[in-house]
Amino acid sequence: MQLNSTEIAELIKQRIEQFEVVSEARNEGTIVGVTDGIIRIHGLADVMQGEMIELPGNRYAIALNLERDSVGAVVMGPYADLQEGAKVTSSGRILEVPVGRGLLGRVVNTLGAPIDGKGAIEADGFEPVEKIAPGVIERQSVDQPIQTGYKSVDAMIPVGRGQRELVIGDRQTGKTALAIDAIINQKDSGVKCVYVAVGQKASTIANVVRKLEEHGAMAHTIVVAASASESAALQYLAPYSGCTMGEYFRDRGEDALIVYDDLSKQAVAYRQISLLLRRPPGREAYPGDVFYLHSRLLERAARVNENYVENFTKGEVKGKTGSLTALPIIETQAGDVSAFVPTNVISITDGQIFLETDLFNSGIRPAVNAGISVSRVGGAAQTKIVKKLGGGIRLALAQYRELAAFSQFASDLDEATRAQLEHGERVMELMKQNQYAPLSVADMSVSLFAVEKGYLKDVELDKILDFEAALHSYMNSEYAELIKTINDTGNFNGEIEATLAEALEKFKATQTW
């Protein structure tokens, strides 16, 4: 087809008429100082707190200090080649990370970019890392359990869906092990999990990922990794990124669990940034807003009501509540829970699981100190059968500790005291549990029933765990229907009690442990 000159002129005229001049006004500033990942920018007006600033080389910084004639920003990534005099521009955007089901089974960095070598991630969208927590009216009370699979936790310190339960203890006391087992135990519960690793060795994070894969838990888990080699900015932001990824499920009427491992290292990273920004130091050289650092993060873990979910999904999801349960981890120094960051987080959370070095070294693992560990939600978030059978466990342990200390000085003890001591010893022994072996509700109930009803009285102390393993095996093969009923309903009635008693009598008669 041949076009003549008139048609060509007409086409050009149409194009000129349709042409729109799009002018985009953008703030530009100049870097006047670069120090340890902190840049000071002059001439950048109208910048928001937390706004992303575009740097040369397709990099970003986040504005944290807004001063009269300059802006202090922290660089996200390498900064060695940044020079004074370089031009930067404001983006008008707050930092966002990818969210969605495509992240499940993947290992990502703070910005949501994959670091596991499995290719690109298909995200459902992007959401800001900093969000306002749901208000009081949008929340619902916590009354559904989230099973950790640990006898000592589920019986004495129950965790509910939407709760914030602190895991606190010295280094090497099993804090990460407890959190990882809680994630493994959600395999068949439909709860999506997020594991945020802050300031840990890359080899440690790789080991955690390997264990999750071995136990089939990676399919329902997102791992957000900000290792010790990452910049302080990425370590500080990692928990917020992970929280946004977990909120995706909460806001759509699902249940999610997030583990922050650990918030002590996040506080140290934030202290480093604050001191470099020349903010005035306070107690232990932390900045004045370190409480707000953790409170605004942990308040986002909540159980939201049906109206919130319905409004958020614009009516797509109805009649469902959503929850985000948080297990923040705090590392103490020589058991000092009265330090600045531990006391802050204890006051924010709904209870704490305190792990003790002495218990750990004496072979009691998980090393839960039942005396000062507490759940402020309590029995409201417990399965009925575990609540009924585990009610006397904490009391038995408390009495045992008191009597054990007293019996060291007393030579002759009366029969009742000796019986209490022996019962306490058996409870202590039964609370021991191997790593990567979380128990189902039914198996846990069988163990609690055995100790509560006195079936362990004549079992030697060093044979109790063998007895328990053999009992679980026997119950799962001979009473599979009962085990299924307990796991499905969690109820406890006279019929179940009678069947459990009959099963234990039969099992003890076999002498197979």
UniProtKB/Swiss-Prot annotation:
<keyword id="KW-0067">ATP-binding</keyword>
<comment type="similarity">
    <text>Belongs to the ATPase alpha/beta chains family.</text>
</comment>
<dbReference type="InterPro" id="IPR004100">
    <property type="entry name" value="ATPase_F1/V1/A1_a/bsu_N"/>
</dbReference>
<dbReference type="InterPro" id="IPR005294">
    <property type="entry name" value="ATP_synth_F1_asu"/>
</dbReference>
<dbReference type="InterPro" id="IPR000194">
    <property type="entry name" value="ATPase_F1/V1/A1_a/bsu_nucl-bd"/>
</dbReference>
<dbReference type="InterPro" id="IPR033732">
    <property type="entry name" value="ATP_synth_F1_a_nt-bd_dom"/>
</dbReference>
<dbReference type="GO" id="GO:0043531">
    <property type="term" value="F:ADP binding"/>
</dbReference>
<protein>
    <recommendedName>
        <fullName>ATP synthase subunit alpha 2</fullName>
        <ecNumber>7.1.2.2</ecNumber>
    </recommendedName>
</protein>
<feature type="site" description="Required for activity">
    <location>
        <position position="373"/>
    </location>
</feature>
<feature type="binding site">
    <location>
        <begin position="169"/>
        <end position="176"/>
    </location>
    <ligand>
        <name>ATP</name>
    </ligand>
</feature>
<dbReference type="InterPro" id="IPR020003">
    <property type="entry name" value="ATPase_a/bsu_AS"/>
</dbReference>
<dbReference type="Pfam" id="PF00306">
    <property type="entry name" value="ATP-synt_ab_C"/>
</dbReference>
<keyword id="KW-0406">Ion transport</keyword>
<dbReference type="InterPro" id="IPR036121">
    <property type="entry name" value="ATPase_F1/V1/A1_a/bsu_N_sf"/>
</dbReference>
<comment type="subunit">
    <text>F-type ATPases have 2 components, CF(1) - the catalytic core - and CF(0) - the membrane proton channel. CF(1) has five subunits: alpha(3), beta(3), gamma(1), delta(1), epsilon(1). CF(0) has three main subunits: a(1), b(2) and c(9-12). The alpha and beta chains form an alternating ring which encloses part of the gamma chain. CF(1) is attached to CF(0) by a central stalk formed by the gamma and epsilon chains, while a peripheral stalk is formed by the delta and b chains.</text>
</comment>
<dbReference type="InterPro" id="IPR038376">
    <property type="entry name" value="ATP_synth_asu_C_sf"/>
</dbReference>
<keyword id="KW-0547">Nucleotide-binding</keyword>
<keyword id="KW-1278">Translocase</keyword>
<keyword id="KW-0375">Hydrogen ion transport</keyword>
<dbReference type="InterPro" id="IPR023366">
    <property type="entry name" value="ATP_synth_asu-like_sf"/>
</dbReference>
<keyword id="KW-0997">Cell inner membrane</keyword>
<dbReference type="InterPro" id="IPR027417">
    <property type="entry name" value="P-loop_NTPase"/>
</dbReference>
<keyword id="KW-1003">Cell membrane</keyword>
<dbReference type="InterPro" id="IPR000793">
    <property type="entry name" value="ATP_synth_asu_C"/>
</dbReference>
<dbReference type="GO" id="GO:0005524">
    <property type="term" value="F:ATP binding"/>
</dbReference>
<dbReference type="GO" id="GO:0005886">
    <property type="term" value="C:plasma membrane"/>
</dbReference>
<dbReference type="Pfam" id="PF00006">
    <property type="entry name" value="ATP-synt_ab"/>
</dbReference>
<keyword id="KW-0472">Membrane</keyword>
<dbReference type="Pfam" id="PF02874">
    <property type="entry name" value="ATP-synt_ab_N"/>
</dbReference>
<keyword id="KW-0813">Transport</keyword>
<dbReference type="GO" id="GO:0046933">
    <property type="term" value="F:proton-transporting ATP synthase activity, rotational mechanism"/>
</dbReference>
<dbReference type="GO" id="GO:0045259">
    <property type="term" value="C:proton-transporting ATP synthase complex"/>
</dbReference>
<comment type="function">
    <text>Produces ATP from ADP in the presence of a proton gradient across the membrane. The alpha chain is a regulatory subunit.</text>
</comment>
<keyword id="KW-0066">ATP synthesis</keyword>
<keyword id="KW-0139">CF(1)</keyword>
